């Protein structure tokens, strides 16, 4: 079981690394107007809105492994397209949309939940959260460095390489056994469930703030304050230290100590504070304001992210793929809206 879980954690890690590694630099390196760059960031999310829940449903029907393989292949195709045409904003948008069509995040989470016993799930969900946290930290530090030396296309080639590695690992994993559950809940009833809606709406706003932040920070620091693009990694590295620590706290207290609700409320409050500080930073043209806002943002995101997936996976067994698909679809809906909002709000400061 452990080999299965760690293989899946790597696949999830690679998926999130591929997502995070693009965010810090796309707004600084992509050529185009602010709204086009926002759309390039958000196209991935728009596609996920459409395909996340159907992929989750598909995995409930044909099995997690087959659904994962299909999603990895689609994501790899989109990555190659982005790598080849990274200088064309419209083809970049198309490639990002194809990347998002390989919506396997929920499938991988459901796969892990299927093979881990109920009494051990909190421990492995904490490890999954730690894997996401490590992807987040590594992406924030490495992305600006790689882009400054090799260009934006190199990051997409890296995403394609991670797809190949993930596919090889997937070949060695066994399909989880199907268990007959006594649940009679329909998909429609599941979506109407109060807890499902609360978690999904929370994920929408969390990812909206995430993408708005990453579109904004590139436009503000580079476009307005004259910060060197090659030095962006320094900002992200410092922020990631705080975020990584917060992710560990969330993984331990959220599942192991049953403090998920308290941690999530704390993340919401810190989110609001970080946005307030960051939104006023262009008016003061003070990089310290932007940095403090970024640190608070990383802490808030890292506290909230591990909790959402873990809590949703506990709500249902028979339709776990659908539930996590709905959660991810709402999250990527927020990502798409946040990308456009961030570009729209900060565009006047970089014109």
Locate each region found by the language model:
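Cytoplasmic helix-loop-helix junction between adjacent transmembrane helices
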Residues: 95-131
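Central cavity-lining transmembrane alpha-helices of secondary-active solute carriers
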Residues: 42-55, 237-249
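Short amphipathic helix-loop junctions that connect adjacent transmembrane helices
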Residues: 24-35, 215-231
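C-terminal transmembrane helical hairpin of 12-TM major facilitator-type secondary transporters
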Residues: 261-308
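Helix-to-loop junctions at the C-terminal end of transmembrane segments
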Residues: 52-63, 246-259, 346
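Conserved MFS/SLC helix-loop-helix module at the cytosolic interface between two early adjacent transmembrane helices
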Residues: 50-86
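Juxtamembrane intracellular "pre-TM" segments in multi-pass secondary transporters
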Residues: 175-202
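Cytoplasmic membrane-interface "Motif A"-like loop-to-helix N-cap segments
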Residues: 61-71, 256-268
């Amino acid at each position: 079981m452990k080999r299965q879980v760690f293989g899946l954690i790597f696949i999830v890690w690679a998926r999130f690394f591929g997502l995070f590694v693009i965010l810090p630099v796309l707004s600084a390196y992509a050529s185009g107007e602010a709204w086009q760059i926002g759309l390039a960031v958000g196209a991935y999310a728009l596609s996920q809105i459409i395909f996340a829940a159907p992929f989750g449903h598909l995995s409930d029907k044909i099995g997690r492994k087959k659904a994962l393989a299909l999603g990895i292949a689609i994501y790899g195709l989109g990555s190659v397209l982005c790598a080849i045409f990274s200088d064309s904003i419209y083809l970049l948008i198309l490639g990002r949309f194809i990347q998002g069509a390989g919506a396997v995040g929920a499938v991988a989470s459901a796969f892990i939940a299927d093979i881990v016993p109920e009494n051990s799930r909190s421990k492995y969900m904490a490890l999954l959260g730690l894997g996401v946290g490590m992807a987040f930290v590594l992406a924030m530090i490495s992305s600006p460095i790689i882009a400054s030396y090799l260009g934006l296309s190199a990051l997409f080639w890296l995403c394609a390489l991670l797809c190949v590695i993930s596919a090889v690992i997937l070949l060695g994993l066994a399909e989880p056994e199907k268990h007959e559950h006594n649940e009679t809940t329909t998909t429609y009833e599941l979506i109407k469930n109060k807890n499902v809606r609360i978690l999904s709406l929370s994920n929408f706003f969390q990812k909206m703030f995430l993408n708005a932040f990453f579109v904004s920070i590139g436009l503000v620091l580079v476009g307005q304050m004259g910060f060197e693009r090659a030095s962006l990694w320094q900002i992200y590295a410092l922020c990631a230290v705080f975020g990584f620590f917060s992710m560990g706290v969330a993984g331990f207290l959220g599942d192991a100590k049953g403090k998920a609700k308290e941690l999530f409320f704390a993340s919401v409050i810190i989110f609001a504070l970080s946005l307030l500080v960051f939104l006023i930073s262009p008016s003061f043209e003070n990089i310290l304001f932007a940095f403090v806002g970024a640190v608070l943002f990383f802490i808030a995101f890292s506290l909230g992210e591990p909790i959402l997936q873990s809590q949703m996976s506990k709500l249902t067994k028979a339709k776990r793929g659908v539930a996590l698909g709905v959660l991810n679809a709402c999250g990527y809906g927020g990502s798409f809206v946040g990308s456009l909002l961030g570009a729209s709000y900060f565009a006047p400061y970089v014109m």
